[in-house]
């Protein structure tokens, strides 16, 4: 309007009638709240000096430190499997609340992402294994079948099983104080807690670069990979089934993309010469 007095207009930022809070701050507050939730400490971890319990195989990372705690129906016992300087093992003394395992109760975990078998190395530089009398020992300087184990996770409980025999570690020492891997079934005396001081990370996608692509690009990559090197790799030489990409997507998720794509490739070749 001509002649209006614009100097009387109060300056400032845009004010929204929806509420007093700035809408742009809502996301930040939510993000901060989620961050605080992630940083919450598990009381069980605090009681064990920062050593958290491993609940499944996917949390087992090679190169980390682990300890084998004697499990109990009442919860944490803070009692661990301990290596002795004579190569044998015993059950250590209970730790006070808030204290982690001793150095002789800590093992270096050896594991590859694509294998469920694990190996453990003591602070004395020897690998944990089972001798001919089924005694838990650490004598070997290299890993063999006797130095390999699997962890059985079921219904929130964990058992320690040898690969060389279908026997489980018992946490009940003999008269000499040594422990054995000689139990045929996993009962209360065979229950353990595997603990680590490593920071828990999110799930890791171990699939290859090709498997992580979308269905069409994934199949194209594998056709190129398995074609003869002398074949020109222009699009006219690459036979791709443009139908049924749902099967490829499912195989990518299941980890069976290699087999499915090779089967599809063979079928396309056979159809061509029919």
UniProtKB/Swiss-Prot annotation:
Main localization category: nucleus
Biased composition (Basic and acidic residues): 34-43
Entry-linked InterPro entries: Actin-crosslinking, FRG1
Example GO BP: actin filament bundle assembly
Recorded superkingdom: Eukaryota
Protein name listed in UniProt: Protein FRG1 homolog
Residues covered by region (Disordered): 27-46
Region forming the signal peptide: none
Transmembrane segments: none
Motif Nuclear localization signal location, chain numbering: 20-36
Keywords of the record: Actin-binding, Cytoplasm, Myogenesis, Nucleus, Ribosome biogenesis, RNA-binding, rRNA processing
Compartmental location: Nucleus, Cajal body; Nucleus, Nucleolus; Cytoplasm
Keyword Repressor: no
Xref: Gene3D superfamilies: 2.80.10.50
Taxonomic source organism: Caenorhabditis elegans
Alphabetical list of SUPFAM superfamilies matching this protein: Actin-crosslinking proteins (SSF50405)
Protein role: Binds to mRNA in a sequence-independent manner. May play a role in regulation of pre-mRNA splicing or in the assembly of rRNA into ribosomal subunits. May be involved in mRNA transport. May be involved in epigenetic regulation of muscle differentiation through regulation of activity of the histone-lysine N-methyltransferase KMT5B.
Motif (Bipartite nuclear localization signal) on chain: 252-268
